[in-house]
């Protein structure tokens, strides 16, 4: 509360204020009679319970208060209008001058402030007209005792870090940081720091903000913090893909290009590789006579079985070629022997014939073929001149009849037949022998049996 050319501060002796807080004028101290304030200039209108309960009086009072506030905001230099002092209680509404003078005389700093205020009043109002109290915050010099010794480096000693990252251009004065072993860093202010407003604002914050892109924070995110290294040495950004970045924006743009380029390349390469593998697997499956499933594991299994079958077929064909050649040579030798016996001469070709027979007897023809279809499974094995056939199919009528027709086409001599039923399937086993002079191959027998059984099943399905 400020009255006249002085000020009141509640931090001083409270005993001096006792007289000003008593509501009864008879109990006021005698020193209040010597006040220099003209009490006749003030008037406080009396209020009663009936007046407060009246709505019209309350509205009128509110309008008066609003008008007064409006006038105070427009012209602070306007003189306070005279009021009536009939009901004025000086013990409640005034502060004696000797109390104010006593408070000012206690502190030298307050004396200095009073002198400045008086100079300010005399400069503004040379005629001595009453003026409101000036703004003391712009005139006072607040001295603040530092909590810690003032330092000149931030984040530790300059000899340790070598760089003050808060005071990059030496524009922040009076601010320092003191290392604390318990909680990291603690900031302290220098006593020379003034609380007044400086018109020339530092360009440090402006430069930092303008150097960053829009909607980009001052502190990087976690993935961008990972590339920050060498805080003490001054190297702020790590090399990515053998590239050095000098700013946050360049590092962000470089990281984006680095990640996008490699990510797209890797994704495209992986996708192309999978497509190539799928094409190769489909092509491989088309080579099989009877593929089972479309998955890669089944295709690989079918490929292994088919390769083994081809190897057995190659060996079988080689043996058949040798047997046919040996048969032709043998017939020629027999013909020569017969001609020599008719002439009474011994033949010198017999030892050679015996050697060739021994070599051919050591090589036995063998082949094994398996074929599958939706309704049937065929297993054909040939050992020398014997053919063993196993046929498994679902229960259908006349299955044995169609299998016998196929055996008759290949001129196979039927030796033994076994049949049975397991669940919903018929199982037949045929033991046959290859006739002399006939060429029988396991793959041909299996293929013919499958075709005959499948045609039968298709005909039955159409008929049903």
Curated annotation (Swiss-Prot):
Residue segments, region Basic motif: 261-274
InterPro entries: bHLH91-like (IPR045895), bHLH_dom (IPR011598), HLH_DNA-bd_sf (IPR036638), MYC1-like_bHLH (IPR045896)
Compartments where located: Nucleus
Gene disruption: observed consequences: Male sterility due to failure of tapetum programmed cell death (PCD) and degeneration required for pollen maturation. Male sterility due to delayed tapetal PCD and aborted pollen development.
An example Gene Ontology molecular-function term: protein dimerization activity
Keyword Hydrolase in annotation: no
Keywords: Developmental protein, Nucleus, Transcription, Transcription regulation
Gene3D superfamilies: Helix-loop-helix DNA-binding domain
Domain (bHLH) ranges: 261-310
Superkingdom of this protein's organism: Eukaryota
Keyword Ligase: no
GO terms under biological process: anther wall tapetum development; pollen development; positive regulation of programmed cell death; regulation of DNA-templated transcription
SUPFAM superfamilies: HLH, helix-loop-helix DNA-binding domain
Pfam family, one: HLH
Region ranges (Disordered): 338-357
Renumbered residue ranges of the record's region Helix-loop-helix motif: 275-310
Record family assignment: Belongs to the bHLH protein family.
Function statement: Transcription factor involved in the regulation of tapetum programmed cell death (PCD) and degradation during male reproductive development. Interacts with TDR and promote tapetal PCD by regulating the expression of RTS, and the two lipid-transfer proteins C4 and C6, which function in microspore development. Acts downstream from and interacts with TDR in the regulation of tapetal PCD. Regulates directly the aspartic protease AP25 and AP37 during tapetal PCD. May not target the cysteine protease CP1.
Subunit and partners: Interacts with TDR.
PANTHER family given in the database record: TRANSCRIPTION FACTOR BHLH91, TRANSCRIPTION FACTOR EAT1
Record protein name field: Transcription factor EAT1
This protein's encoding gene: EAT1
């Amino acid at each position: 509360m400020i009255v006249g050319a002085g000020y009141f501060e509640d931090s001083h002796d409270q005993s001096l204020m006792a007289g000003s807080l008593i509501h009864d004028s008879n109990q006021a101290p005698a020193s209040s009679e010597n006040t220099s304030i003209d009490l006749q200039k003030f008037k406080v209108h009396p209020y009663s319970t009936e007046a407060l309960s009246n709505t019209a009086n309350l509205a009128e009072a509110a309008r008066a208060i609003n008008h007064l506030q409006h006038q105070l905001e427009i012209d602070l230099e306007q003189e306070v209008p005279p009021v009536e002092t009939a009901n004025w209680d000086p013990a409640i509404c005034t502060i004696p001058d000797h109390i104010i003078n006593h408070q000012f005389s206690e502190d030298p700093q307050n004396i200095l402030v009073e002198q400045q205020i008086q100079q300010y009043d005399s400069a503004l109002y040379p005629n001595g007209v009453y003026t409101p109290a000036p703004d003391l915050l712009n005139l006072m010099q607040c001295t603040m005792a530092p909590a810690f010794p003032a330092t000149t480096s931030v984040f530790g000693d300059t000899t340790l870090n070598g760089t003050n990252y808060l005071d990059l251009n030496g524009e922040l004065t009076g601010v320092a940081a003191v290392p604390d072993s318990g909680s990291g860093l603690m900031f302290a202010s220098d006593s020379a720091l003034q609380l007044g407003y400086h018109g020339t604002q530092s360009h440090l914050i402006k430069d930092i903000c303008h150097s960053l892109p829009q909607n980009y924070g001052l502190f990087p995110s976690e993935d961008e913090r990972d590339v920050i290294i060498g805080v003490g040495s001054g190297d702020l950004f790590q090399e990515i893909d053998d590239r050095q970045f000098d700013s946050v924006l360049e590092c962000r743009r470089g990281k984006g290009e680095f990640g996008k380029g490699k990510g797209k390349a890797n994704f495209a390469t992986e996708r192309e590789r999978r497509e190539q593998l799928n094409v190769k697997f489909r092509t491989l499956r088309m080579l099989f006579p009877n593929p089972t499933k479309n998955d890669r594991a089944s295709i690989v299994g079918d490929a292994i079985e088919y390769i083994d079958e081809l190897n057995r077929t190659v060996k079988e064909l080689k043996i058949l070629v040798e047997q046919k050649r040996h048969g032709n040579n043998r017939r020629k030798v027999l013909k020569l022997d017969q001609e020599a016996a008719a002439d009474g001469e011994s033949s010198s070709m017999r030892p050679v014939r015996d050697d060739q027979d021994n070599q051919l007897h050591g090589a036995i023809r063998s082949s094994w073929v398996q074929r599958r279809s939706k309704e049937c499974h065929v297993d054909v094995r040939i050992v020398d001149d014997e053919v063993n056939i196993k046929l498994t199919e679902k229960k259908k009528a006349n299955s044995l009849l169609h299998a016998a027709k196929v055996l008759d086409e290949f001129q196979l001599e039927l030796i033994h037949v076994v049949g049975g039923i397991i669940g919903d399937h018929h199982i037949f086993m045929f033991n046959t022998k290859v006739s002399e002079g006939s060429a029988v191959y396991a793959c041909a027998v299996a293929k013919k049996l499958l075709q005959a059984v499948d045609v039968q099943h298709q005909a039955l399905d159409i008929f049903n």
